Amino acid sequence: MAAAVAEVPAGERGATRVADRVVAKIAAQAAREALRTAAPDTRTDAHASVTIRRRDDRQSLGEAHVRVAVELGYPSDIGAQCGTVRYQVAERVRALAGMEVPDVAVEVERLHSPLEESAGRERVR
């Protein structure tokens, strides 16, 4: 039995496919991790959508084009936070899913102001 397996070339034995929703979950979690690191005291949230372009060869898992929507605290360095998210998402998807990530689009859905949050806690007379 072992001799029969050894005769089949590695590329013809099968392939691993990572589902789009799994890559989206990895990307969203990576974005949340990046935001917690960049602004630990600020309320943040993130979710992601992914488009995967699969290649015909079995040696590659394909490319993941990621779009991440985030909520950030304000005032803050929004550009730096988006850059941190972009880098972290690309690295985590590459490491955990084995896919190349040529681009990560970061969309800021909402900004949270400390004044807005404290206004909700004030007592009404």
PLM-predicted stretches and their roles:
Residues M1-T84, A95, M99-R125:
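Contiguous, often N-terminal, cationic amphipathic patches that form binding interfaces
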